[in-house]
Amino acid sequence: MSRITSMLVTHKKASISEIENAWHGDVEALLKWVSSHDTVEECAVLKTCNRVEIYVVSPRGEKVLFEIAKKARVSSRIIDIHDHDESLLHLLRLASGLESMIIGEDQILGQMKELYRTAKSLGYTGWVLDTAFKKAIQVGKRVRKETAINERSVSVGSAAVDLAEQILGGLEGKSVLVIGAGETGELISKALVSKNIGSLYVTNRTFGTALSLAASLGGTAVPYEEMKRKIREADVVISATSAPHYILLKDDIERAMEGRKNKLLIIDIANPRDVDEAVREIEGVELHNIDSLKQISDENMRLRMREIERVEAIIEEELELLRAKYKRREAEELLARIYSEAEKIKEQEVRRAMNKLSAYHTLGEIEQKVLMDMSHSIVNKIFAEPTKALKSAAERGNTEMLRYAMELFRLNQEESD
C-alpha cells in the first residue's frame, strides 16, 4: 500500500505574502499539476488564507513534493514535509481546529469538506486519502460536539470583528462596511450584528448575493460600483473577497478620506489581499490584515488550554483506530497477493492433474469440480493460520513480520522488477 506524504506551507512558518505566493492558481489547476507526476496515485489540496497543503499518495512522495516546491519556487525554509503517520495526525488536528491561527475555529472544517469534495469529485482521491479525510472530518465534528473548543470567537471572520472592537473600544453605534458576501463575509456580518452596531453595509460583485445577506440581517446592500463612495461613511471596513488582485488602492482610500475628520479602520482578511499595503501611509487610516489576528489567536490559546487537552485525548483515541485501519489494509493487500500467487499455482497443478487423469479416461464435470473444490480447500486451510497471524501482526504494528512474509513469498522481487 502506498502511503501519504504531505507538504505544508502555513502561518506557523510563512507570512501571509509567502502563503499567497506559494501557489497563484486555483485548486483544480494545482490538483491537475500534482497528479500529472508519474508516481502520484492520489492527491488532495487544502488552500485557505492561512495555508497551502498538498497531500500525495506515492511510493516517492517526498521526492515528488520537493520537485513541486522547487518548480513553484517555494523556499524550503517555510515548508514542512510530513510522512504518513505525521500526515494523519496533522489532518485530525487540523479538522479539530488545533492547527488554525484561531484555535478551535469552525471555518476550517467546512473548508476541508469542500476541498476534499473537489478532489474526490474530480477523481484525484482513492481509498488511502478517502479514509484519512473522512476520519478527519468525523473527528472534527466529534470534537466540537464533546468539547467547548469552539465556544468563543473562533473563525477568522469573528476574530476580525473582535479585533475591530478591541481597537475602537467597542462597536456600538459604528457604521461598518463588509466587502464580500461569501461564507466569510456572512460570518463577519453575523458577528457584527451581535455587537449592536449602528449600520451594516454589505457589498459584493453579485448584487443579489449582497442583497440577500443584508436583508437577512437588517443591513443595507450596496452596489459594488458604489463601494468606494460608501467608504466615506464607514467607521470600519472589513474586506473578505476572493478577488485575485487589489480591489482598494491607495488613491481610492485617499479620496474617501478627503474632508473627513474621524479615523478609518480597515481590516483585510482576504488571500490574496484586497487592500494595497500602501494604504498604511494615509493619515487617519489604520490597516490590519491576517497577520494582525495572531493577537486574537494568542488570547484564545490561553483561554482554551483546558479544552485542548480534551481534544488531544479524542485525537489520540481516533488516531489509533485510523492507524489500525491502514495496517489491516496493508495486511489484506499482502494476503491478496499471496493468495493470488497460490491461486496461480493451484490452477497450474489442477490442470496438470486433469491432463494426467485424462490420459486414462475422460473426466466428467463432477470429477473436475471435486478436484477444483479440493485444491481450493487445501489452499484455504494451509493459509488460514498464516492469514490470522499476518492480520494480527499488522494491527500490532509488527512491520517486520509483514516484511518477512513478503521475502518468504518472494513478493518484494515483484516490486523491484
UniProtKB/Swiss-Prot annotation:
Keyword Nucleotidyltransferase among UniProt keywords: no
Gene Ontology biological-process annotations: protoporphyrinogen IX biosynthetic process from glutamate
Pathway: Porphyrin-containing compound metabolism; protoporphyrin-IX biosynthesis; 5-aminolevulinate from L-glutamyl-tRNA(Glu): step 1/2
InterPro entries per UniProt: 4pyrrol_synth_GluRdtase (IPR000343), 4pyrrol_synth_GluRdtase_dimer (IPR015896), 4pyrrol_synth_GluRdtase_N (IPR015895), GluRdtase_CS (IPR018214), GluRdtase_dimer_dom_sf (IPR036453), GluRdtase_N_sf (IPR036343), NAD(P)-bd_dom_sf (IPR036291), Shikm_DH/Glu-tRNA_Rdtase (IPR006151)
Transmembrane segments: none
Annotated substrate binding sites: 48-51, 100, 105-107, 111
Keyword annotations from UniProtKB, A to Z: NADP, Oxidoreductase, Porphyrin biosynthesis
Residue sites binding NADP(+) per the record: 180-185
Active site: 49 (nucleophile)
E.C. designation(s): 1.2.1.70
Coiled coil: none
Marked site (Important for activity) residue numbers: 90
Reaction catalyzed: (S)-4-amino-5-oxopentanoate + tRNA(Glu) + NADP(+) = L-glutamyl-tRNA(Glu) + NADPH + H(+)
Enzyme class: oxidoreductase
GO molecular function: glutamyl-tRNA reductase activity; NADP binding
HAMAP family in the cross-refs: Glu_tRNA_reductase
Record remark: domains: Possesses an unusual extended V-shaped dimeric structure with each monomer consisting of three distinct domains arranged along a curved 'spinal' alpha-helix. The N-terminal catalytic domain specifically recognizes the glutamate moiety of the substrate. The second domain is the NADPH-binding domain, and the third C-terminal domain is responsible for dimerization.
Function: Catalyzes the NADPH-dependent reduction of glutamyl-tRNA(Glu) to glutamate 1-semialdehyde (GSA).
Family to which the UniProt record says this protein belongs: Belongs to the glutamyl-tRNA reductase family.
Subunit structure of this chain's protein: Homodimer.
General remark: During catalysis, the active site Cys acts as a nucleophile attacking the alpha-carbonyl group of tRNA-bound glutamate with the formation of a thioester intermediate between enzyme and glutamate, and the concomitant release of tRNA(Glu). The thioester intermediate is finally reduced by direct hydride transfer from NADPH, to form the product GSA.
Protein name: Glutamyl-tRNA reductase
